Amino acid sequence: QRQMCIRDSLVTALSAATVFSGCNKKVDYDVDGDGSSENSGSGDSGALASRLGIPESYEGDIEVGDSGLKSIKIKDDDISIPSSDSMSIINYKSNTFDNAYKQKVCEAVFDKSKGIYVYDWEHQTKSDLQSQIDSFQAMLEEAKASGDTETESYCNEYISYLEDEMTNATDERTGAGDYSATDFIGNIGDYEYMLSFSDSEEGLGANFELSYYPSEGLINYKPHEGATYVYAYDAQYGDEDVDESMPNSCTFTQDEAVSLAQEFLSSCGIDDVIPTYTSQLLWEYYDTSYDVVATEYDGYIMTFGRSVNGTAPYSADLSMVDSLSSDDDVWYDSTSETFTIQVDSNGVINASCYPLLAPTGDEQKNVELMSWKDLLSALNKNVPAYYTENKTSYNDIEYNDVRLTYYCMKDESQENIYQYVPVWIFAQADEEDGTYDYDYPVQAIMVLSLI
C-alpha cells in the first residue's frame, strides 16, 4: 500500500546543503550557494526585503535542463514575506495533555457551578440515554407524519435498544475527579456540551474537541419548523442554490467573533496563534427524508494557525502535487497545528483544536538567510534536477505563489523535538472560475532559506 500521509504532505525541500526529506528516505541536491550571504540582523520593520534583495513582485524563467518540461516560470505580483526584520529557528516538543491541563480547559469552558462530569461511552447515565431517546422520538414523529417508513422502523428499533440500556444505567454522572478521564460533560449557559481530549505517546496527536451534547440533538439547540436535523458548517461548502445574499443573524460582527475565538483559545492556554481563515457559519435544516427545508447564516467559522514570530507557517494541502514520490518506502508528512472555532450569537459553540506542539523555550534568533540572488541561482541549478528525477504530468509550470515563511520539520538529532524553520515556498495554484486556491497547489517546492 502506498505510504503517504496526504493530510499535510511534505514536498521538496531544496536547501543550501541538503534538500529532500521523506520519513524514510533522504535525497540530497547540492546547492553550493557560492554567492555572499546577508545577515538578517536587527533593524527597522521591512528591512528584511531590502537586506536580502527580495522584490515585491517577480517574473522570470527557471532553466528546464533535462527535466523534459517545456517551461518553468515564476510569476507572482505579490511576494509574501514576514513583517518582521529577522527570522529565527524555534524549537518545540511533542505535546501531551496531563490531568492539570484537562482541568484547566474544562473549568475555563464549562460553568463550574453547574458541575463538570466524566462521560463514559460504555456506561451512560439514564439522563444521557433519555436525551437520545427524546431526539429519536422527535425523529420518529416526523417520520410518521411524512410517511417515511424506513426512518420510522429505524427509530423504533433504536429507541427499543436505548430503553433496554436504561435498565442498567446509573442515575447520576460521576464527577470529573482528578480529570484522568478523556471525555467530560458540562454546561455552557443553558446547554450541555462535551469536551473530548486525545493525545499520543508516540508522534503527534494532541487534540481536543468541543461539541454540543448530544450531537444528534443539535436541532433542540436551534429548532426550526418542519426540521428534524440541523447541521452547521462552513458556508463556502454550501450548495450552489444557497442564497448568498442572506443576512447573517449573528449578534456579533465578524471581528468580534474572531476576538471571542481568540479569547476562548487563550483561556485554554493557547495564545501564540494567528487567524488564517474566516467564513460565515451556515445552518442547514433537513426533514426526515433529508430534504433541505431551510438555511440561514448565524455566526462564523474561523481557523487559526500557530503564530511563529507573528507569521503563520505554511500549511497548504499538497495532495495534488503529482511530483511527490509514490515509492512504498517514502512517507511524506508534516505538522500542521490548526484551531477551528465556530461562534454564533451565544458565543463559542464548537471547537476543534490541534495544539500538537509545546514550546521548549529554545530559539536561534537572527539566523542568516539566503539572498534572493543566491536563491534564484539555487533554483536554476536544482529545480531541473528535481523534476528530472521526480516526474510531473504538467508540461509547463508557473509558480504563482511565492512566499518566505516558516515550516515545521522534525529535528532528527533530538527525540520528540520539532523546529519551525525559515523556508521559501514556490507553489502553483491553478485557476478555477477566476480564482486561485493557494491552499491546494498542484506544484510546490520548498527551499530552506538558511545559509
Question: What feature does the model see in each segment?
Answer:
Residues 1-6:
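Short, small-residue-biased leader/transition segments that mark boundaries at the very start
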Residues 9-17:
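Bacterial N-terminal signal peptides
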Residues 23-328:
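Preferential activation on post-signal-peptide N-terminal prodomains/segments
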Residues 208-242, 249, 336-341, 345-367, ...:
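A short, surface-exposed interaction/processing loop segment used at functional sites
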Residues 258-420, 428-432:
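Segments that shape or occlude catalytic/ligand-binding pockets
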Residues 413-423, 429-451:
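C-terminal soluble interaction/assembly domains
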